[in-house]
Each structure stands twice: as C-alpha cells, then as structure tokens.
C-alpha cells in the first residue's frame, strides 16, 4: 500500500538534506500516516482509514462526514 492519505491525498515530498559543509543530498520527507478506525455518524458505522495527522485534526474540527463531503469522497465505498 502506498503512503498516501486516503482523505487529503497527501504524499511524500522530495527535499534536500543539507549538511554543515552545505553538501546537498536528496531526501524523501514522508507523510505522518496513521491507521485509524473512525466513527462515521451519518453511515452509523466505523470506517477504517489511513489518514495523515493533519487530516485527523481537520476531522476533529469539522467532523468526518462533513470533511469527506467537502473533498468529494464517498465513505460508503470505503
């Protein structure tokens, strides 16, 4: 399974690691993904999702159903 957030679509970022001598090497900055079982009130059931921690904060603020609707994701298919 690829390291992509199922809700926000966040994925790894290509960056550079810069040493003290300013030697640059390529570095992959991974997304902080968590496997979570979230309660979906509208569907009256649990939904298992692999989401980023920033998406979890947004879910706490807006609610799972509202956030998924905003992103155009159908939770019934998950």
Curated annotation (Swiss-Prot):
Pfam families: Ribosomal_L28. Keywords: Ribonucleoprotein, Ribosomal protein. One of its GO terms (molecular function) is structural constituent of ribosome. It comes from the Bacteria. One of its GO terms (biological process) is translation. Residues 1-21 are annotated as: Disordered. SUPFAM superfamilies: L28p-like. GO terms for cellular component: ribonucleoprotein complex; ribosome. The keyword Ribosomal protein applies. Belongs to the bacterial ribosomal protein bL28 family. This is Large ribosomal subunit protein bL28. The lineage of its organism: Bacteria, Bacillati, Cyanobacteriota, Cyanophyceae, Synechococcales. The gene is rpmB.
């Amino acid at each position: 399974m690829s390291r992509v957030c199922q809700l926000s679509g966040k994925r790894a970022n290509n960056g550079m690691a810069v040493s003290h001598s300013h030697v640059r090497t390529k570095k992959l900055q991974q997304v902080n993904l968590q496997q979570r079982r979230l309660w979906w009130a509208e569907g009256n059931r649990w939904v298992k999702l692999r989401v980023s921690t920033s998406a979890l904060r947004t879910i706490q603020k807006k609610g799972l159903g509202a956030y998924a609707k905003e992103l155009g994701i159908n939770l019934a298919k998950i």
